[in-house]
Amino acid sequence: DIIRPEAFYGESRFDFYLEAGEKRAFAEVKGVTLEREGHCLFPDAPTERGVKHIRELQRAAETGLDAVLFFVVQIRDIHSVAPNDATHPAFGEALREAAAHGVRVLAYDCDVTPDSLKIRREVPVIL
């Protein structure tokens, strides 16, 4: 089994490339810090690079690779994560399209200390 950081696919560099047996996957990790009334939104500012990554993940999924967009929520006990359509509509559109084409979209909240970040629990993603 392989976990390789900073892996290239197409014209993008993803956070991770993973292999387990016959399975191969690319994963992109996004840190989430914008919270509104118990719900988190991403991105907090327009991100053309983020849209590019999502589209490249979709291309990977369409070729049969596993593709994952992983939101790491740096706030405890939030209710959901959603695309911030008000700030960057193209990101939300790309995310929904990618999810419809096989990209897995996951979110987890975590405990953050000065020395560590510990994944805690899965959080619903509202597309």
Region roles according to the model:
Residues 26, 69-71, 107:
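Structural beta-sheet core signal
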Residues 19, 64, 109-112:
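Surface segments flanking catalytic/ligand-binding clefts of nucleic-acid enzymes
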Residues 63-76:
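Glycine-rich phosphate/pyrophosphate-binding loops
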Residues 14-44, 57:
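Conserved catalytic cores of phosphodiester-cleaving nucleases, focusing on short active-site segments
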Residues 40-46, 83-86:
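Short glycine-enriched, charge-decorated loop/helix-capping segments at active-site entrances
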Residues 52-62:
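Histidine-anchored nucleotide/phosphate-binding helix
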Residues 1-9:
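A short acidic/basic microdomain associated with nuclease active sites
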Residues 74-127:
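Domain-level recognition of nuclease-like catalytic cores that cleave nucleotide substrates
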